[in-house]
Structure formats: structure tokens, C-alpha cells
């Protein structure tokens, strides 16, 4: 399972890459949270299936994937993005959103997999607890049943964090939440910092077979 439903403003539509004769585009989707904070979600999609324009409000369905690329310094960077099937949704997206527009959140995700990395439960100075972990999601795509493995960073807070801390590597888990972005400072040298954007799954609830 790996499905995300999003609503937001699409911006910065530009060419991404090609596979064979198929061209792909990329864009940013600006998704507002209830508190007014905006998440910037990376999108990928087939060029021919894109009928959207800059700053248009769109409603879409897709899945969350990871891609590891090598930087100029030789290090690897993992990008998290949403691949959306504008041309082949699993259900009638426009009709569904029209009928449920006022009931739907802007950002809803369900994804399952196995925990491949889990940190210790942390208690912050304000007393709140959180935990970071990564799940490996196996997605079957295309007519040839091609398998795609993605590694998705997750964060949970409060009781959910305390419960997840009881799990271990290889535990099977289904997460219900949303995809969010956050800025952080990366130290480049003793005097220089660079502002970067990370993406992670915010866990609202979860179930496990363990």
C-alpha cells in the first residue's frame, strides 16, 4: 500500500527526465496545513498527462517514492517525491474531490512496509517525545509488475512515538499520516551554513502485525 491524496497550488513546472520515448515533468505542490504553514512537495509525472498551469489549484492522487542521486562531492542524497498518475488514477479523482471537497484534508497518506532503521525515543527540552524511523516500501508498478523499493523517513510524536519505540528493525507497519517538508541548516564549513529542505512522513496513527 502506498497512496497519497493532495490538494494545493502547482508551481515551477519544468522538464525532469526521459525514459525511452516518455518524457517526464517535475513541479512543486504548495500544500497548506491547518495552522497556515506551507509544505512544498516535489512532484513527478508524465509530460503528456499534465494539463495544469502555474499557480493552479489541483487535486491529485499518487504515491510517495525515494530516489538516491550522487552529488558533485561524491556523496549520495535521497530525494523524496510524489509520483502522480494524472492519466491513470485508481479512482475518479475529479468526481471524488467534487463530491467530498469540504470533507477532505489537503494531505492524506497511507503507506506500509518494514522498518529498516529506527532511532531511540527522544525527549525534548519542552517534555515532548518524538522518534525518527525509516520504512522500506515495496511498490508494484506498471503492466509488467515492476517492483520499486522506496525508503521513506518518518517522524512520530507523543503516544505514537512511544508505541513505535517498542518496535524493532524488520517490524511490519502501516502508517497513516501526511507528507511534510521542513527547512534545516546544513554546515558547509566552519563559517558557512546552507538552508536545505527535507521531506518526511508525519505519523498520525499506525497499525502493525507484530
Task: Report each predicted region and the residues it spans.
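Single-stranded nucleic acid-binding surfaces, predominantly the OB-fold ssDNA-binding core
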Residues: 1-210
Amino acid at each position: 500500500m502506498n497512496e497519497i491524496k493532495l490538494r494545493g497550488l502547482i508551481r515551477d513546472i519544468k522538464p525532469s527526465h526521459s525514459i525511452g520515448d516518455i518524457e517526464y515533468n517535475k513541479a512543486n505542490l504548495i500544500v497548506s496545513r491547518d495552522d497556515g504553514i506551507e509544505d512544498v512537495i516535489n512532484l513527478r509525472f508524465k509530460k503528456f498527462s499534465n494539463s495544469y498551469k502555474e499557480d493552479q489549484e489541483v487535486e491529485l492522487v499518487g504515491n510517495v517514492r525515494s530516489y538516491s542521486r550522487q552529488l558533485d562531492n561524491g556523496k549520495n542524497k535521497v530525494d523524496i517525491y510524489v509520483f502522480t498518475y494524472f492519466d491513470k488514477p485508481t479512482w475518479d479523482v475529479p468526481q471524488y474531490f467534487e463530491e467530498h471537497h469540504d470533507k477532505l484534508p489537503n494531505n492524506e497518506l497511507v503507506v506500509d512496509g518494514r522498518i529498516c532503521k529506527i532511532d531511540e525515543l527522544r525527549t525534548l527540552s519542552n517534555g515532548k517525545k518524538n522518534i525518527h524511523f525509516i520504512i522500506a516500501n515495496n511498490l508494484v508498478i506498471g503492466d509488467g509488475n515492476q517492483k520499486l523499493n522506496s525508503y521513506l523517513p518518518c517522524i512520530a510524536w507523543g503516544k505514537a512515538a512511544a508505541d513505535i519505540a517498542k518496535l524493532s528493525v524488520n517490524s511490519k507497519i502501516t502508517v497513516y499520516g501526511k507528507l511534510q517538508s521542513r527547512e534545516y541548516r546544513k554546515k558547509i564549513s566552519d563559517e558557512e551554513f546552507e538552508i536545505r529542505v527535507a521531506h518526511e512522513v508525519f505519523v498520525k496513527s499506525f497499525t502493525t502485525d507484530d
